[in-house]
């Protein structure tokens, strides 16, 4: 039995979780189905920013050489995707990458991961031209959208420069050349614009980045970096030497970056985690970034809730990578489910991860209580918030991949209320076949292509399991019981019963007029 406490010192359920969402690449935002999927997401989840790769990829056709060898710029594609995002209520979180071929010169091209995407990762032949590209781009945005709007956007320099697959020149070249040239170019347009980095993998180089900017008077308004749960097995072979308790690597990395900024020369910098998703593992021998079913299955729903609750007070934003399985970085998804990272699959069917965010979106108000870690069974947690007398609770039972058998979590919770009387209790649950359709697809035989009725069945399986207890009596407390199997999530909403709905009332005079008109019609 758990007795939830009312603690007004816990703060409010923040919007950190919903400040940003990611899309694979800028070019994908030219596709109507990508925009349609974002519209579905925005209709229910309401993110504020959208971040994506490849703004300067050659498929965006932003720069070329004219007949005299001078740089010529064209912003049509970027304008189109920016307009689309703004129409959906999304502001751009621009990642300034990759390197256009026109800036590289006559050298062998280096392509980042995956090679098939043709993302050029060479250094520019002349860093002044890199700065010019950024300045002309930002200047165009201000001309088109106005400074008051553009100063609310973010400009992040590059993507994961600490990985050779994305920036072979290394961190020294990033810190001393790539970032400074871009940052000064942004600020040349207006000092009110926000620029930052280092956009590293694994929360690395944040402290070094800040100190380098301070030492050399390089502009910086925020820090950004990435983390994935599976990262622990990349850093620590079979977790040997890992300082993190089982299941706490992800939140631990967030805390380390939070501390690094707090202890730096610029302790008030915003912290943005511009990539994360539910990719997890249980061994260093079989790490996979492209065939990991944790992004499709009901595991993902519990993973989202567990990790977002653990970090929502440790940063300014955290962007799920990515919105939709319309994602071409490693080749377009080739089946209904393909271990692609989207909240929606290629048909726009909602995964467990989408539903987890939907339940988290319902959580609002002052945080009453949050319980996890050593106080509960491994992998379990619960959080409650209250607003205007309505109490909202979310609980999860995450089966960590290292655990072979996760017990059911049978619980009774005692919830304090302000008034005695009758309450209604409404629940929504993510489970296999209800809020998680991946398992239903597997039961179908995992077909590569599906019929219309199969698609409808999967959409139905993607709907959560709802329940209601219409009358629960309270004497200072409401008692609620639930059962969660492995990787299930439940949302519970408790509110005072309202007055019974009144029937439609028609006055005697109006009724007489109606009857008289009916009689006339019969004649």
Report each predicted region and the residues it spans.
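Substrate-binding cleft and catalytic face of glycoside hydrolase catalytic domains
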Residues: 45-245
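Mature N-terminal, pre-catalytic/accessory segment of carbohydrate-active enzymes
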Residues: 1-48, 486, 496-523
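Conserved, mostly hydrophobic/aromatic
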Residues: 20, 85, 137, 155, ...
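C-terminal beta-strand-rich structural cap/linker in extracellular carbohydrate-active enzymes
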Residues: 449-523
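Carbohydrate-binding surface patches
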Residues: 377-421, 426-443, 486-495
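Short, acidic/polar
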Residues: 28-42, 205-213, 301-307
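Aromatic/acidic polysaccharide-binding cleft in carbohydrate-active enzymes
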Residues: 275-406
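Glycoside hydrolase catalytic-domain groove-lining segments
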Residues: 37, 231-287, 307, 313-325, ...
């Amino acid at each position: 039995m758990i007795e939830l406490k009312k603690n007004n010192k816990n703060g409010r359920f923040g919007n950190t979780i919903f400040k940003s969402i990611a899309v694979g690449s800028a070019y994908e935002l030219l596709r109507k189905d990508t925009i349609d999927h974002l519209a579905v997401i925005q209709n229910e989840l309401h993110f504020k920013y959208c971040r994506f790769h490849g703004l300067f990829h050659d498929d965006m056709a932003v720069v070329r050489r004219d007949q005299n060898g001078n740089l010529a710029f064209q912003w049509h594609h970027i304008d189109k995707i920016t307009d689309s995002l703004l129409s959906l209520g999304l502001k751009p979180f621009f990642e300034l990458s990759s390197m256009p071929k026109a800036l590289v010169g006559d050298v062998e091209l280096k392509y980042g991961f995956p090679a098939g995407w043709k993302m050029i990762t060479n250094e520019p032949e002349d860093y002044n031209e890199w700065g010019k590209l950024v300045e002309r781009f930002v200047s165009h945005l201000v001309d088109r959208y106005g400074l008051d709007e553009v100063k609310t956007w973010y400009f992040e320099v590059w993507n994961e420069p600490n990985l050779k697959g994305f920036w072979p020149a290394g961190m020294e070249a990033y810190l001393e050349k790539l970032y400074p040239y871009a940052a000064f170019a942004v600020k040349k347009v207006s000092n009110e614009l926000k620029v930052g980095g280092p956009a590293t993998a694994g929360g690395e180089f944040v402290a070094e980045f800040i100190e380098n900017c301070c030492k050399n008077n390089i502009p910086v308004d925020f820090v950004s970096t990435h983390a994935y749960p599976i990262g622990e097995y990349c850093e620590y072979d079979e977790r040997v030497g890992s300082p993190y308790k089982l299941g706490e690597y992800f939140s631990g990395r967030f805390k380390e970056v939070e501390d690094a900024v707090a202890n730096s020369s610029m302790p008030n910098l915003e912290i943005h985690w511009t990539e994360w998703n539910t990719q997890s593992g249980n061994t260093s021998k079989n790490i996979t970034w492209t065939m990991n079913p944790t992004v499709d299955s009901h595991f993902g729903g519990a993973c989202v809730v567990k990790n977002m609750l653990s970090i929502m007070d440790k940063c300014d934003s955290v962007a799920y990578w990515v919105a939709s399985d319309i994602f071409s970085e490693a080749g377009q998804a080739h089946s209904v489910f393909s271990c692609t990272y989207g909240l929606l699959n290629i048909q726009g069917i909602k995964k467990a991860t989408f539903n987890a965010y939907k339940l988290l979106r319902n959580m609002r108000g002052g945080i009453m209580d949050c319980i996890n870690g050593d106080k509960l069974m491994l992998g379990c947690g619960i959080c409650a918030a209250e607003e205007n007398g309505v109490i909202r609770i979310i609980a999860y039972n995450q089966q960590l991949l290292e655990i072979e058998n996760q017990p059911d979590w049978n619980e009774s919770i005692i919830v304090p209320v302000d008034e005695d009387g009758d309450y209604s209790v409404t629940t929504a649950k993510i489970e296999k076949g209800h809020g998680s359709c991946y398992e239903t697809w597997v039961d179908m035989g995992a077909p590569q292509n599906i019929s219309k009725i199969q698609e409808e069945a999967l959409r139905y399986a993607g709907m959560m399991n709802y329940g209601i207890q219409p009358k629960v009596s309270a004497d200072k407390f409401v008692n609620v019981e639930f059962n969660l199997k492995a990787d299930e999530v439940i949302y519970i909403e408790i509110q005072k019963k309202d007055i019974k709905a009144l029937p439609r009332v028609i006055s005697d005079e109006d009724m007489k007029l109606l009857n008289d008109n009916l009689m006339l019609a019969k004649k």
